[in-house]
Regions:
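Beta-rich globular "head" domains
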Residues: 16-71
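Helix-rich interaction surfaces within compact, conserved domain-sized segments
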Residues: 67-109
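Hydrophobic beta-strand residues in large extracellular and virion-surface proteins
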Residues: 12, 27-29, 39, 81, ...
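Extended Gly/Ser/Thr-rich low-complexity repeat segments
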Residues: 1-2, 48-62, 98-109
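Glycine-rich, low-complexity segments
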Residues: 1-22, 106-108
Length: 109
């Protein structure tokens, strides 16, 4: 496989009341061979309190430092996420439980 071919997409194990929004695709993650992690899909209905865990990435997908990323909320605005070296993907701000989309979230590990 070349570096541009990502690993197979894996479904995220959602936590704190979040569920996959099947109309817009399950929340999933993948990684290229050169270490870029991609997230995609949409979830709904979960806890929106700051620092609430949405899901946890497996060890080989985790950043070495804390990252702050933007996802898309129900108002088509920026929802702020934290992605920790522990693998926890957490709510930071402007997250709406109606739905939360990860299609534009990526980072290098």
């Amino acid at each position: 496989k070349s570096e541009s071919n990502p690993t197979a997409w894996q479904n995220a194990n959602l936590q704190n009341g979040w569920s996959h929004h099947r109309d817009y695709g399950n929340v999933q993650f993948s990684k290229t061979f050169d270490g870029i992690v991609y997230l995609k899909g949409t979830c709904k209905g979960g806890k929106t309190t700051r620092e609430s865990i949405i899901f946890t990435l497996p060890e080989s997908f985790r950043p070495s430092t804390t990252l702050f990323k933007t996802a898309l909320n129900n108002d088509y605005g920026s929802a702020v996420l934290g992605i920790y070296p522990s693998g926890n993907v957490v709510v930071k701000g402007n997250v709406d439980a109606t739905w939360l989309n990860f299609d534009n979230v990526s980072f290098k590990i």
